[in-house]
């Protein structure tokens, strides 16, 4: 089904000197495996005593090297290498441009707040089904934990998880549960001839799960120790600092279920620790059942006729009246009316992290081509300004990027997020270079040919697979597209000029308030230089970044 999977098959066959047919016929080879063969392998490798040996390197003392005095390199502009000239001479076969067709997916309203998206399966007899319920962890925070358990849950009254998995397997089916801020997902795939039986099993499983108390306790204990140690983990602290800068009190590290609503303990006079787990079978099961009462989009890919599929969908987990959805959820970001600096001190960090945030303007798909062109010009890999000016010229960073991100629905604000990872003693200079790029972007119009080629090919290559087509098309429609974005935008892409990028930059980036977020070693970060150029530095402690 997947083009990339086919490429991987050819790659592996070539690399390991194997026959391509062996990969193509792998399905038949798997079906030919007998129970006796599986038992023989299990006896050979899984029986008897085993020992597990783990070795930890520890953290050896590292030497902090002084910043070398490197003069910026100035590579030649507008010059083409002999390799490039010869590469362009290689003959190519013209490719017929094809576009996505929204008509490939049929939409049908089955009931109020229940919509079917049907895509014909032209490849095989395996169906795929995704139930996308219009509620997520933003409205129902306990879904985060309920979903973890559902992936290993048994079924009432007393069917254990292993037996449930066997029942799915006997029908040639598999399942998984997932959740985001906005949506609760149930994904199922299997042999289409067993569709009705699989849906009956899914419904029983979802509405009557048998959750394991030991797994609940293990999950909550893991959450407890994760929160206990998060202030000591530099990567987590950096993530929490960025969340705080972008979302303030809406940060996921602050706006979450308090630990004392998940677990608490007390110590008896005799020293015995008494644990109380406040998440339990009852409230987690109720959470799942409530989630299946929200508006649901049914994304189905199979060979059955759409009328038969619509009839079968009456068996999915849902209530007589499905509640309206408030999704997708777009968290409100912080806005700043002037450039400011946040700094979190961590003397143990060998590499400092610097983020740059600009809150943008309301998004509209009419901006897509200009935005994509700006992103490619500003941060398009090693040819982009950020990597070229900061890493290639000045050897100032290991990693650097900066691009504009657009929301998943129109009308909400876009934003630019930049990043530089560098040594603490290079932070002040790296900030100066990045800020200069934001406020005085250099002009290299000779790059337009490569940018146009990249955007043209990227637009044509944006073709979702058969099974994901309905969800991708629906997302494009939510943005406001009535046809394939490639078809809509290709003419604008082909007629791009540097003025389009320059205008987008001047209207959205140049001289906008920038929030500079830094985490690094206070002994070597030149805070005086930063303060002199960008004003007051707000020092943030890890305690401010976490709640609950």
Q: Which ranges hold each PLM region?
A:
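Proteolytic maturation boundary segments
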Residues: 24-132, 267, 272-274, 285-286, ...
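Short, conserved charged micro-motifs
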Residues: 196-197, 306-310, 365-366, 425-430, ...
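Active-site glycine-rich loop that binds ribose-phosphate moieties when present
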Residues: 278-283
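Structured mid-domain segments that build the active-site/substrate or prosthetic-cofactor binding neighborhood
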Residues: 380
